[in-house]
C-alpha cells in the first residue's frame, strides 16, 4: 500500500480537477476516478464510490466548483444562478441522512443568494466564490479532525484516571471513519490514531495504555472489513476484525481476562462516527451503532466495579451537528437496495494469491423481502461523550448542550 492510497480526495487547485479514490474497489485495487460534474458526484455518492459524511460534503463542494469551471470554459452563457441552485438541490438528494452534504450545499446556496440575483448569469465571480468555499471546507475539515483526535484522547485519559484503571485497554469501532471518510486523519478512527500514537505502551507515561482495536465487519456493505482494516493495516495499529454479531462475546471474553489473538486487554471504549447529530444528542450513524450503544449500556449495568465500565463515544465535526432538528425521530433514514444484503461483490482471489475479475455472488434465497436501512440512531441517553473539534461534550444533568 502506498501512502497516497489513503488520500480519498484529490483536488488540483491550479487545473481545477477532482479525482476520488473508488472505495468500491478497495482493498484489492486502488483506482482514482475523475469527477467532472455535479451529476458525476451524485452518482459517485449514491453508489458509495465515496462515502463518509465529511468526505461526501467535500466532494460535493468540489464537484460544484469543477462543474462551474468546465461550464465557463465551454463558452456557454445561458446558465443562471437559479439553474445552479437547482443543481445543488439535486446533489443533496444523493445521501439524505448525512447532514454534512446538506449543510455544505445550503451554505453554498446562501453565499450565492447573498452575492447574486437568481437571474444573474453564472460568471467567473460565481466560480471564484465556489472555489474559495470548497478549498476552505477541505482545509478546515483536516485541521478539525486532528483536534477531534486530541479531544478524544483527552476524554479517554481523563476517564481512565477517574476510574483508577491500570493496564492495557482495547477499543471497538464500526464502519469506516478514517482518512477514507474525511479529508484525512478521520473522526472516530482519528481518535484511535491519536490514542495509538500517544498512549501505546512504548510511549505512554500513564499506568494505562492502548493495546488493541476491534473493527466490526460492518454488514451489509462491509466498510469495516474493506476500508477500516485497510487503514489500520497501513498505520500498523494492532487490530483484530470481528463480525457485527460478535461484540457481546468479545466484551465478555476479554472481561474474563481470556486471550483473543494475543490480547486480553478489556474493551474500555466504543468509538463511532456520525452522519448526523441532532440537538438533543441523538446520533445517526451506520446501521449497528445503536446496538453497540445498547450493548455498552447492558454491560455497564452488570459491572460492579467502576474501572470495568465501558464508555460509548461519538466523534464528529461541528458540521455534523444539526441544531435545527430536535430529536433523532425526525431524521430521514436512507434505505439501500435489497441486493446489497442478498449478494456480495468482490474480486475473485485465485489460489496463487493473485486477484481476478470482480464478481457478484448471491448469498440469500432469491426474491425474498429485505429491509436494508443504511443508518440507525443511537439515543443520547446511551452516549457518554460526543467529541468535536471544540471539546469532548459530556452530558450535564443528563442532557447534551452544544
Curated annotation (Swiss-Prot):
<feature type="site" description="Transition state stabilizer">
    <location>
        <position position="175"/>
    </location>
</feature>
<dbReference type="InterPro" id="IPR042529">
    <property type="entry name" value="IF_2B-like_C"/>
</dbReference>
<dbReference type="InterPro" id="IPR011559">
    <property type="entry name" value="Initiation_fac_2B_a/b/d"/>
</dbReference>
<keyword id="KW-0486">Methionine biosynthesis</keyword>
<comment type="function">
    <text>Catalyzes the interconversion of methylthioribose-1-phosphate (MTR-1-P) into methylthioribulose-1-phosphate (MTRu-1-P).</text>
</comment>
<dbReference type="InterPro" id="IPR027363">
    <property type="entry name" value="M1Pi_N"/>
</dbReference>
<dbReference type="InterPro" id="IPR037171">
    <property type="entry name" value="NagB/RpiA_transferase-like"/>
</dbReference>
<dbReference type="InterPro" id="IPR000649">
    <property type="entry name" value="IF-2B-related"/>
</dbReference>
<keyword id="KW-0413">Isomerase</keyword>
<comment type="similarity">
    <text>Belongs to the eIF-2B alpha/beta/delta subunits family. MtnA subfamily.</text>
</comment>
<dbReference type="GO" id="GO:0046523">
    <property type="term" value="F:S-methyl-5-thioribose-1-phosphate isomerase activity"/>
</dbReference>
<keyword id="KW-0539">Nucleus</keyword>
<protein>
    <recommendedName>
        <fullName>Methylthioribose-1-phosphate isomerase</fullName>
        <ecNumber>5.3.1.23</ecNumber>
    </recommendedName>
</protein>
<comment type="pathway">
    <text>Amino-acid biosynthesis; L-methionine biosynthesis via salvage pathway; L-methionine from S-methyl-5-thio-alpha-D-ribose 1-phosphate: step 1/6.</text>
</comment>
<keyword id="KW-0028">Amino-acid biosynthesis</keyword>
<dbReference type="Pfam" id="PF01008">
    <property type="entry name" value="IF-2B"/>
</dbReference>
<dbReference type="GO" id="GO:0005737">
    <property type="term" value="C:cytoplasm"/>
</dbReference>
<feature type="active site" description="Proton donor">
    <location>
        <position position="275"/>
    </location>
</feature>
<dbReference type="GO" id="GO:0005634">
    <property type="term" value="C:nucleus"/>
</dbReference>
<dbReference type="GO" id="GO:0019509">
    <property type="term" value="P:L-methionine salvage from methylthioadenosine"/>
</dbReference>
<dbReference type="InterPro" id="IPR005251">
    <property type="entry name" value="IF-M1Pi"/>
</dbReference>
<keyword id="KW-0963">Cytoplasm</keyword>
Amino acid at each position: 500500500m502506498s501512502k497516497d492510497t489513503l488520500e480519498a480526495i484529490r483536488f488540483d487547485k491550479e487545473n481545477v480537477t477532482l479525482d476520488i479514490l473508488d472505495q468500491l474497489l478497495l482493498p484489492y485495487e486502488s483506482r482514482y476516478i475523475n469527477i467532472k460534474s455535479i451529476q458525476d458526484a451524485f452518482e459517485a455518492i449514491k453508489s458509495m464510490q465515496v462515502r463518509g459524511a465529511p468526505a461526501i460534503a467535500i466532494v460535493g463542494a468540489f464537484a460544484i466548483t469543477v462543474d462551474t469551471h468546465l461550464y465557463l470554459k465551454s463558452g456557454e452563457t445561458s446558465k443562471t444562478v437559479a439553474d445552479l441552485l437547482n443543481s445543488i438541490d439535486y446533489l443533496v438528494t444523493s445521501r439524505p441522512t448525512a447532514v454534512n452534504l446538506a449543510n455544505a450545499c445550503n451554505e453554498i446556496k446562501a453565499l450565492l443568494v447573498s452575492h447574486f440575483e437568481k437571474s444573474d448569469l453564472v460568471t467567473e465571480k460565481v466560480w471564484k466564490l465556489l472555489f474559495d468555499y470548497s478549498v476552505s471546507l477541505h482545509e478546515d475539515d483536516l485541521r478539525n479532525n486532528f483536534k477531534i483526535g486530541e479531544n478524544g484522547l483527552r476524554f479517554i485519559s481523563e476517564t481512565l484516571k477517574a476510574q483508577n484503571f491500570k493496564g492495557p485497554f482495547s477499543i471497538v469501532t464500526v464502519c469506516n471513519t478514517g482518512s477514507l471518510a474525511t479529508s484525512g486523519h478521520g473522526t472516530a478512527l482519528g481518535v484511535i490514531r491519536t490514542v495509538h500514537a500517544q498512549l501505546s505502551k512504548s510511549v505512554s507515561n500513564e499506568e494505562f495504555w492502548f493495546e488493541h482495536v476491534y473493527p466490526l465487519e460492518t454488514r451489509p456493505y462491509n466498510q469495516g472489513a474493506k476500508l477500516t482494516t485497510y487503514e489500520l493495516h497501513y498505520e500498523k495499529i494492532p487490530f483484530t476484525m470481528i463480525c457485527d454479531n460478535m461484540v457481546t462475546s468479545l466484551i465478555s471474553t476479554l472481561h474474563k481476562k481470556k486471550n483473543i489473538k494475543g490480547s486480553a486487554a478489556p474493551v474500555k471504549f466504543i468509538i463511532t462516527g456520525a452522519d448526523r447529530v441532532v440537538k438533543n444528542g441523538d446520533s445517526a450513524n451506520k446501521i449497528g451503532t445503536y446496538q453497540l450503544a445498547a450493548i455498552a449500556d447492558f454491560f455497564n449495568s452488570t459491572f460492579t466495579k467502576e474501572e470495568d465500565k465501558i464508555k460509548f463515544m461519538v466523534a464528529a465535526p461541528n458540521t455534523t451537528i444539526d441544531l435545527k432538528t430536535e430529536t433523532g425521530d425526525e431524521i430521514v433514514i436512507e434505505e439501500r437496495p435489497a441486493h446489497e444484503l442478498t449478494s456480495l461483490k468482490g474480486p475473485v482471489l485465485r489460489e496463487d494469491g493473485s486477484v481476478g475479475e470482480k464478481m457478484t455472488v448471491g448469498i440469500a434465497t432469491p426474491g425474498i423481502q429485505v429491509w436494508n436501512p443504511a443508518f440507525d440512531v443511537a439515543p443520547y441517553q446511551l452516549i457518554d461523550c460526543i467529541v468535536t473539534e471544540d471539546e469532548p461534550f459530556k452530558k450535564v444533568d443528563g442532557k447534551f448542550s452544544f
